């Protein structure tokens, strides 16, 4: 079974009280074993997103499972968009 490299754009929703914890969320994502790189980048109007590079095994439901685990990190994790995907 091969592996797939996926580059994600993870947006963080603005909480009602204060600003989002980009650093905390990025650190938690970085600690996931599939993640090779994780970086906070500017989006627009002072908002940021987290760019994630992950190496995932090939198979049915693996990509969806990874995305679900990222969503569970924090209630403010918004959209998770796969920007690029390729085989190793």
Task: Annotate the PLM regions.
Residues 1-88:
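Long, contiguous binding/interaction regions
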């Amino acid at each position: 079974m091969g592996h797939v490299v996926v580059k994600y754009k993870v947006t963080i929703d603005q909480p009602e009280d204060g600003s989002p914890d980009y650093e905390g969320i990025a650190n938690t994502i970085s600690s996931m074993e599939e993640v090779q790189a994780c970086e906070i980048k500017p989006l627009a109007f002072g908002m940021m997103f987290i760019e994630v590079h992950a190496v995932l095994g090939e198979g049915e439901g693996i990509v969806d499972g990874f995305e679900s685990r990222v969503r569970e990190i924090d209630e403010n994790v918004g959209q998770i968009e796969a920007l690029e995907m390729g085989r190793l």
